[in-house]
């Protein structure tokens, strides 16, 4: 009976992951095309403030709906999931998690030099940098997506759902690795690169450890936001420096 329940939980979790990924794409496409539609309808420049405002409003609405749906999924397995008052001892894990992510980046760079004798940038990162360099609406879209949308949605999918539906009763580390690898693959499947997979997977594992140690998803979300927020500063610098 226990094995049947575990299989049922796994299948349900897979369905929720697919739903989450689809909703993530809906946010990106919906916010992008809403901006394109309004600027074309008004006959104004693609970087017009009205277009950017519509894009942000649509992104906010779609993100709120997605967070509500995915939170419902997580709460079915972890009923106490919600925004709790931040505690100092648990907040420290945001710093630990960010340090682990930095360490993961260093390990990946070292592996690149050992096996390929050069440092390569993930295609996903290159695409974000190219969009950011365009400035205007593209820069706003990238920053909002990276700093706010991605941490909220991806943490609910890859930590909230996977760590609660996938082998929750198994060894502590087992679904942590699954969470990390699936998170990594999600970021490289369009243009697979082994070193990018390693880096994103290690980042995902770091975020999973934060969630498991604190038992509250707000801390892995905060860690994800911190990491992406700092990275976004360099994107903004590129945009204004180009």
Stretches found by the model and what they are:
Residues 3-5, 17, 62, 77-78, ...:
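Short, functional N-terminal and low-complexity linear motifs
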Residues 131, 135-242:
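Transmembrane helix-loop-helix hairpins at the membrane interface
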Residues 90-102, 130-142:
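Alpha-helical membrane-spanning segments of integral membrane proteins, especially the hydrophobic core
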Residues 1-95, 99, 105, 109, ...:
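N-terminal, membrane-interfacial amphipathic/helix-forming hydrophobic leader that caps
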């Amino acid at each position: 009976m226990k094995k049947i329940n575990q299989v049922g939980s796994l299948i349900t979790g897979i369905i929720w992951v697919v739903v989450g990924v689809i909703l993530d794409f809906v946010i990106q496409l919906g916010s992008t095309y809403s901006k394109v539609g309004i600027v074309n309808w008004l006959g104004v420049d693609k970087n017009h403030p009205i277009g950017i405002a519509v894009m942000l409003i649509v992104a906010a609405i779609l993100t709120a709906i997605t967070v509500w749906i995915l939170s419902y999924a997580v709460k079915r397995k972890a009923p106490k999931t919600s925004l709790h008052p931040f505690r100092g001892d648990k907040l420290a894990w945001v710093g630990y998690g960010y340090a682990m992510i930095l360490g993961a980046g260093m390990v990946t760079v070292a592996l690149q030099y050992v096996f390929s004798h050069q440092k390569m940038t993930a295609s996903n990162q290159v695409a974000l940098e190219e969009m950011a360099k365009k400035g205007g609406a593209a820069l706003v879209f990238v920053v909002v997506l990276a700093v706010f949308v991605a941490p909220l949605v991806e943490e609910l999918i890859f930590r909230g759902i996977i760590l609660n539906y996938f082998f929750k009763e198994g060894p502590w580390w087992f679904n942590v690795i699954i969470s990390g690898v699936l998170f990594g693959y999600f970021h490289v499947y369009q243009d697979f690169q082994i070193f990018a997979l390693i880096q994103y997977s290690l980042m995902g594992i770091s975020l999973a450890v934060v969630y498991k140690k604190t038992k509250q998803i707000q801390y892995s979300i905060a860690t994800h936001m911190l990491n992406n927020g700092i990275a976004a500063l360099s994107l903004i610098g590129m945009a204004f420096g180009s």
